[in-house]
Every structure is written in C-alpha cells, then in structure tokens.
Amino acid sequence: MSIRRPQIPRLLLQNVSCMRNAQQILRHVNVSLHDGGALVLTGTNGSGKSTFLRMLAGFSKPSAGEILWNGHDITQSGIFQQYKLQLNWISLKDAIKERFTVLDNVQWFELLENKIGKAQPALELMGLGRLVKEKSRMLSMGQRKRLQLARLLAIDRPIWLLDEPSVALDDEGVRLLEYIIAEHRKKGGIVIVATHLPIDIEDAMILRLPPRFPRKMTLIDMLDRADIS
C-alpha cells in the first residue's frame, strides 16, 4: 500500500516579517493556501494589509521568512518571472484610462495578455454592458470599481490579490464581487482579500492584523491632557 504524500501548498508563507520606516509591520506570519483557497486580511488602517499584499505581489520583500510558490522562493529572479504571471492585482489605484471607452479599457489589457474575447462577457456580468461605448471618465466610483472587476475576469489569472475590492460598491456590486470570487475558487483559483468592510467568502481563512501605529492625537486629546488651572 503506497503512502500518499501531503500536497504542497500553492502559496506558503513561513515566519514572514516585514519592516516599514524602521517599524515592524508584520511579525512571524504563517499562512498556507491550496488551490481554491481564500484568505481575508482585516485590521485597522496602518496594520499592514496593503503591505501584506504588496509582498505577495513581489513589490517588496519580507525582512524575514519566506514566501513560497509551488515550493519555490518568489524572491528568486527566475521563479518570480513565472510567479508574477499567475497574479491579478486590484488596488485603490484603478489604472483606468480616462480617454478610453469602457470596452477599450478591458480590451487593452486583453491585448497585453494575448487573451481576446472575454471583455464583453465580463462587462455584461458586472452590469456594465450598456456602457461599453461610454468614456471611462464618465463613470461613477462604483462603476469604476466594477470596471476593475471586469478586467480581473477578462485577464483570468489564477491568483487574485484584492485590496479593498468592495469600496464604492453598492449592495448589488458586493454580491457580484462575492459571486465572482466563489466562481474563481471553484476553478481552483486562489483569492486573497484585504478589507475593512464585511464580505462573505465561504470557508475563507481570516487573518486579523493588529494595529501598529498609535492614533494621531486630536485637539480634544490635547485639551484633555493640558493642565489648565
């Protein structure tokens, strides 16, 4: 009888720490994600949610520990070139080209990826089908977020890194976001979300990052502390 070896996690963080401006942001974080897995990062502003995602995207390196993809350290140049092709990133900077139409904004990224034909269906799914010929500068904040999500669907990479993806979305938009995350995971995709807003992701691991920066003192605080006689 053969013994089945445990499957290697697709993504593995081992004792990962991170410094920013000489201050410890993340300390000894351990996370493993297999195909279809999801991780939700929560915490106050300044707790390191975006820093965590930036490390996973390879924009910065951990000060200690390792981030492994398929068992290989992503900071190794040869590995990183393969790893970055697995990533799809959404941040608060939407990278929307104002002079392009809604459709062109998605098709432009399709051309870069050599993936054609998914732009229109993705926009339809995200409720932007009637706006495909509109200039992107005319979109509301919620519609811009939907456009980002449509681009995510059209490019269709296996690992999604989503920084505050539900910001500016109405209730219907949040439900669509939850739906496309669920569908992506059914196909074996991995989703990592940083958020301070409620979002329903079934069986997701929750990692709450503790606050790292003291709250700025307000005028009321100063008056309370002042020794006024």
Curated annotation (Swiss-Prot):
Main location group: membrane
Keyword Metal-binding applies: no
Enzyme class: translocase
Catalytic activity: heme b(in) + ATP + H2O = heme b(out) + ADP + phosphate + H(+)
Bilayer topology annotation: Peripheral membrane protein
Residue ranges annotated for the ABC transporter domain, each copy included: 11-228
One family name in Pfam for this protein: ABC_tran
A cellular component term, taken from the record's GO annotations: membrane
Disulphide-bonded residues: none
Protein's name in the database: ABC transporter I family member 1
Species the sequence originates in: Arabidopsis thaliana (Mouse-ear cress)
Lineage, opening ranks: Eukaryota, Viridiplantae, Streptophyta, Embryophyta, Tracheophyta
